[in-house]
UniProtKB/Swiss-Prot annotation:
Catalytic activities: L-glutamine + H2O = L-glutamate + NH4(+)
Alphabetical keyword list: Hydrolase
Superkingdom in the source lineage: Bacteria
Family: Belongs to the glutaminase family.
Gene Ontology BP, a term: glutamine catabolic process
Subunit structure: Homotetramer.
Identification of the protein by name: Glutaminase
InterPro entries found in the cross-reference section: Beta-lactam/transpept-like, Glutaminase
Lineage of the organism: Bacteria, Pseudomonadati, Pseudomonadota, Gammaproteobacteria, Pseudomonadales
Binding site for substrate: 61, 111, 155, 162, 186, 238, 256
Keyword Hydrolase on entry: yes
EC id: 3.5.1.2
Gene Ontology molecular-function annotations: glutaminase activity
Length: 302
């Protein structure tokens, strides 16, 4: 496995320079673009990694999975009264579909859906940002995971579209807490800094029927685990989820920080990171690396 990971990074490295680092978040625009890392973690605790897999980066929308899991833990099926679990077919920050569907987001991984999930969690936790940080630390076994306040502040200063979505949902009665307070929590979730190794470990419960090896806790039950993996498979890569399923064939979730997490149910989790994005906002070299890994080992769920 170690040799294979090294080979794959060598093969996809020429793609660096063809994408573009996210620049709509000023604090992310200065990230060094030629970084590339990959980590594979098995449900038995075996770890393999290559490249910049130990270097922390801004996980951004990957955090939406952690938020969803927290909401499922304390509210269960009730969350689906306020949002759906269908692909949107629209940009992740679209307002048009949200208004047409009367303030009920299509799924928890578009921005509006993630904000509803954060609103649900805001009602549950006295300090949502801290609760999220502590939750993630338990999942990955790394007490050094922190939220980057500079990135969070930068995103908060450019919050207009997310605020518009939240207030639109509030006008339809689907947002219960103070919008600014929820946005504060949301951006601190997105600004969490984790490495490929951290994320591969943190997501391994989704490859093991909801059981987290590091904390020894049953994070989700088997049915809930299947549901989260299903939503990742259909909606985890913005409006490129179909292409990712076609090329990689695994449940996944991406973020504009350049990270992608993928789950091989019953076996492994894989995290790749390369900051340069394609036109859909997903890591260009990251998708190519996952495609090669899936092809060579036969990990596709299809």
């Amino acid at each position: 496995m170690q040799q294979l990971l090294n080979e794959i990074l060598d093969e996809v490295r020429p793609l660096i320079g063809r994408g573009k680092v996210a620049d709509y978040i000023p604090a992310l625009a200065g990230v060094e673009p030629n970084q590339l890392g990959i980590a594979v973690y098995s449900r038995d605790g075996e770890l393999f990694h290559a490249g910049d897999a130990l270097r922390p980066f801004s996980i951004q929308s990957i955090s939406k999975v952690f938020s969803l899991v927290q909401a499922i833990q304390h509210s269960g099926e009730d969350i689906w009264q306020r949002l759906g679990h269908e692909p949107s077919g629209q940009p992740f920050n679209s307002l048009v579909q949200l208004e047409f569907e009367r303030g009920k987001p299509r799924n928890p991984f578009i921005n509006a859906g993630a904000l509803v999930i954060c609103d649900i969690n805001q009602s549950r936790f006295a300090a949502p940002a801290q609760s999220m940080r502590d939750f993630v630390r338990r999942l990955c076994g790394n007490p050094e995971v922190v939220s980057d306040s500079v990135v969070a502040r930068s995103e908060y200063q450019h919050r207009s579209r997310n605020a518009a979505a939240a207030y639109l949902m509030k006008s339809f009665g689907n947002f219960h807490n103070d919008v600014e307070a929820v946005l504060f929590s949301y951006f601190h979730h997105c600004a969490l800094r984790m490495s490929c190794v951290d994320l591969a470990r943190a997501f391994c419960f989704l490859a093991d029927k909801g059981f987290c090896k590091h904390s020894g806790e049953q994070v989700l039950n088997e049915r809930q685990t299947k549901q989260v993996n299903a939503i990742m498979a259909t909606s985890g890569l913005y409006d490129e989820a179909g292409n990712f399923a076609y090329r990689v064939g695994l449940p996944g979730k991406s973020g504009v920080g350049g990270g992608i997490i993928a789950v091989v149910p019953g076996r492994f989790t894989v995290c790749v990171w390369s900051p340069e994005l394609n036109a859909a906002g997903n890591s260009l070299a990251g998708i190519a690396a996952l495609e090669k890994l899936s092809e060579r080992i036969g990990w596709s769920i299809f």
